A protein has these predicted regions:
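N-terminal core-binding DNA-recognition domain of tyrosine recombinases/integrases
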Residues: 1-73, 91
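Flexible interdomain linker/hinge and immediately adjacent N-terminus
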Residues: 58-87, 134-137, 177-182
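Catalytic-site neighborhood detector that most strongly recognizes the C-terminal catalytic loop/helix
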Residues: 76, 135, 232, 236-257
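Basic, Lys/Arg- and aromatic-enriched nucleic-acid-binding interface segment
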Residues: 84-113
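C-terminal catalytic core of tyrosine-transesterase DNA break-rejoin enzymes
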Residues: 104, 108, 195, 211-235, ...
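Conserved tyrosine-mediated DNA breakage-rejoining catalytic core shared by Y-recombinases
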Residues: 109, 118-153, 163
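Active-site/catalytic core of tyrosine-dependent DNA strand-transfer enzymes
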Residues: 147-202
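C-terminal secondary-structure termini that scaffold catalytic or DNA-interacting sites
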Residues: 258-277
Length: 277
C-alpha cells in the first residue's frame, strides 16, 4: 500500500502515523508563521483526507484529534477611526461618497462585503424599514431591520446616483455600483474601501473588521445574542457566543448599572431591594 501515492506527491503511508503530523505541525507554525487557528483549519482538511482514505480501506483506521484553541481577540475600528471615516464628503465625488455610504451601511447592518456588493435597490424596503440580504455565506437569505439613521443616507445616495432620468429608482440595479453604473464585485469594492480608509488617515483596511466592530458595539449596548445571530446571518450561536466572550470586558458598564448587588440598600438594619424605575 505504501507504493500507492496520494495526488502523485505523497505516499498514503504518511497518513497512518502521528510523526508526520507532528513535523507538519511544526513546519506550519515555525516556517509559515501561521497561528493556531489557521493551523487547525489546515489540519481539518488533512483529517478529512485521512478519514476518506480510512473509509476506502487504503490505510489503517485511527482517531485524529485536533486541539481546540481559544479564538484570537478580534480587532475593531476605534471611535477616533470611525469619526474620521464618517466625515461626510461631497456627493459630487461619486467613489468617495459611495464608500462613505457603505461605511454607514456597515455600521447599521454588520453585513459582509459580499452581501454589500450584491445588494440591489429592490432589496431596500423603505416603507417597511426592511433590508433583504440575498447573498450570505450560509446561503440563506434574511430580512433585517433598517436603522432609521441609515434611511435618509441611502435615500439621498439613490436619488443622486441610482435613479433614471425621471427620478425613478433603478430597482434591478445594484446599490453600490462602479463608476460606470455596473456591478462592483466584493474584491474591487473592498480595495476601494481600503483606499478610502487610508485617505482618511486610517490604516486599517479590512471590511470584515466592521462585523467585529458591529458585534462589539451591539454587545456593549446590551443587545441580545439571538438578535445578533440573525442580523449577522450565522446559522448557529457558536460565533456570536465567541463575540460575547471576547468582548465580555466591554460589558462592565452594563454590569455596574444592572447587577442586582448594586441595587441593594441597607435600611434600618434590613436589606431591601431598591428597583430602579
Amino acid at each position: 500500500m505504501s507504493d500507492l501515492e496520494f495526488g502523485k506527491i505523497m505516499p498514503l503511508v504518511v497518513l497512518e502515523t502521528d510523526d508526520f503530523e507532528a513535523e507538519y505541525h511544526d513546519y506550519i507554525l515555525d516556517y509559515l508563521e501561521c497561528n493556531e487557528q489557521t493551523l487547525n483549519n489546515i489540519f481539518r482538511g488533512w483529517r478529512a483526507i485521512a478519514y476518506f482514505c480510512m473509509d476506502k480501506g487504503w490505510i489503517d483506521t485511527r482517531n485524529i484529534y485536533i486541539r481546540e484553541v481559544a479564538p484570537a481577540i478580534k480587532e475593531v475600528y476605534t471611535d477616533s477611526e470611525i469619526e474620521k471615516l464618517l466625515v461626510k464628503p461631497r456627493p459630487e465625488d461619486f467613489i468617495e461618497y459611495r464608500n462613505w455610504v457603505i461605511i454607514n451601511y456597515f455600521l447599521a447592518t454588520g453585513n459582509r462585503i459580499s452581501s454589500v456588493a450584491n445588494l440591489k435597490i429592490s432589496d431596500l424596503d423603505f416603507d417597511e424599514g426592511i433590508i433583504t440580504v440575498n447573498v450570505q455565506k450560509n446561503r440563506d437569505p434574511s430580512r433585517i431591520a433598517m436603522a432609521e439613521k441609515l434611511k435618509p443616507i441611502l435615500i439621498e445616495y439613490i436619488r443622486h446616483y441610482r435613479c433614471d432620468e425621471n427620478g425613478i429608482p433603478l430597482n434591478k440595479a445594484y446599490v453600490f455600483c462602479n463608476s460606470y453604473g455596473s456591478k462592483c464585485g466584493p474584491v474591487a469594492l473592498g480595495k476601494s474601501l481600503g483606499e478610502y480608509n487610508k485617505s482618511r488617515g486610517v490604516q486599517k483596511t479590512s471590511c470584515h473588521l466592521w462585523r467585529h466592530t458591529f458585534a462589539k458595539r451591539w454587545i456593549q449596548s446590551g443587545g441580545d445574542i439571538l438578535s445578533l445571530q440573525k442580523i449577522l446571518g450565522h446559522r448557529s450561536l457558536k460565533m456570536v457566543q465567541r463575540y460575547s466572550n471576547l468582548f465580555a470586558e466591554d460589558t462592565k458598564p452594563m454590569v455596574e448599572e444592572h447587577a442586582p448587588i448594586n441595587t441593594v440598600r441597607i435600611n434600618r438594619g434590613k436589606t431591601k431591594l431598591a428597583f430602579r424605575k
